[in-house]
UniProtKB/Swiss-Prot annotation:
The keyword Signal does not apply. It catalyses: L-methionine(out) + ATP + H2O = L-methionine(in) + ADP + phosphate + H(+); D-methionine(out) + ATP + H2O = D-methionine(in) + ADP + phosphate + H(+). The complex is composed of two ATP-binding proteins (MetN), two transmembrane proteins (MetI) and a solute-binding protein (MetQ). It is found in: Cell membrane. Pfam families: ABC_tran, NIL. Residues 2-241 form the ABC transporter domain. This is Methionine import ATP-binding protein MetN 2. The gene is metN2.
Length: 340
């Protein structure tokens, strides 16, 4: 659906060259929700603007639905953009227009007239849950309602791709979740490919199938969301994952557990989706005659499944403890004995 090959974006300012996007390669499948996460200055917003030709690459190619966006110009590019909707952090609504008129705007530009345009506007208002707000102005809407207008407007011409540039960054947590649920629903109903740019790992965890982590213009990590959460490789990825896992990996927690539970062994357990909700702990304790004392843990849900992390104290004979760890591994639970 979307292919980026060796994409580079370089800016020149006062004889200084800034490499905003540094040789990025990506393949995004039709119908998936793909996340790009990074801190400010990582290059993620520059990257997404090349998907619809708002920015042109200095080198490399950007292909969307078999069309080389990086090489077309003029009317061909304008027509291609009708198939690539976009929503923004600050909504970018026309304040002198009502909700219905804002949604109708791209239809007007596309030459859709009369009853056909009114029908499409009403259809979109129902899709995003704004019934009764048709004649309201942006100043009368909440932040979440404004973003719903932005989403409806972006979908007006039945695009195949929806770009979301920090679309929830200006919203409170509850409204953020409501907008994310709406995007999930739209993805499932319309089989729409959605690209999400964000600095919030909660957004990635909640709706994305795959994620690319950017730092200094490069994609430093790429994979299924569940795999990235389980085994983050890069330091920047580990920092992002800790946003939504309560800092499980902090040295402070590990030292606290080792200092306060001197008997037996302290073991970190990592459960995957197939066993994250099963009574594995009680089964292993019973069959190996050990006591398993749960000290700390959490369960994280992603679009690819759930995974859980537990820190447990294992009490029993040396042979029984080793047998229990062996059985846990056989049950596809990853184990790590913490060293004192």
């Amino acid at each position: 659906m979307i292919t980026l090959q060796n994409v580079v974006k370089e800016y020149t300012s006062r004889n200084n060259k800034v490499l905003a996007v540094d040789h990025v390669d990506l393949e995004i499948e039709q119908g998936e929700i793909f996340g790009v996460v990074g801190y400010s200055g990582a290059g993620k917003s520059t990257l997404i603007r090349m998907f619809n030709g708002l920015e042109l690459p200095s080198a490399g190619t950007v292909e969307v639905d078999n069309l080389l966006i990086s090489q077309i110009r003029g009317s061909k590019l304008r027509k291609a953009r009708q198939q690539i909707g976009m929503i923004f952090q600050h909504f970018n609504l026309l304040w002198s227009r009502t909700v219905a008129e804002n949604i109708a705007f791209p239809l007007e530009i596309a030459g859709v007239r009369g009853e056909k345009r009114r029908f499409r506007v009403n259809e979109l208002i129902r899709l995003v849950g704004l019934e009764g707000k048709e004649n309201a102005y942006p100043s009368e809407l909440s932040g979440g309602q404004k973003q719903r207008v932005g989403i409806a407007r972006a979908l007006a011409n039945n695009p195949k791709v929806l770009l979301c540039d920090e679309a929830t960054s200006a919203l409170d947590p509850q409204t953020t979740d409501e907008v994310l649920e709406l995007l999930l629903d739209i993805n499932k109903r319309l089989h729409l490919t959605i690209i999400v740019i964000t600095h919030e790992m909660h957004v990635i965890r909640k709706i994305c199938n795959r994620v690319a982590v950017m730092e200094n213009g490069k994609v430093v990590e790429l994979g299924d969301v569940l795999d990235v959460f389980r085994h983050p490789q890069e330091k920047v990825t580990q920092r992002f994952v800790r946003q939504v896992t309560d800092s499980d990996e902090t040295e402070e927690l590990i030292h606290l557990l080792l200092d306060n539970y001197a008997e037996g062994k302290i073991v970190k357990l990592l459960f995957m989706s197939e066993n994250a909700t099963q009574p594995v702990i009680s089964q292993v304790a019973k069959e190996n005659d050990v006591m398993l004392n749960v000290l700390h843990g959490n369960l994280t849900q992603t679009q690819n499944g759930a995974y859980g992390t537990l820190y447990v104290q294992v009490l029993g004979t040396e042979d029984a403890i080793n047998a229990s760890l062996t059985q846990l591994r056989q049950l596809k639970v990853e184990t790590e004995v913490l060293e004192r």
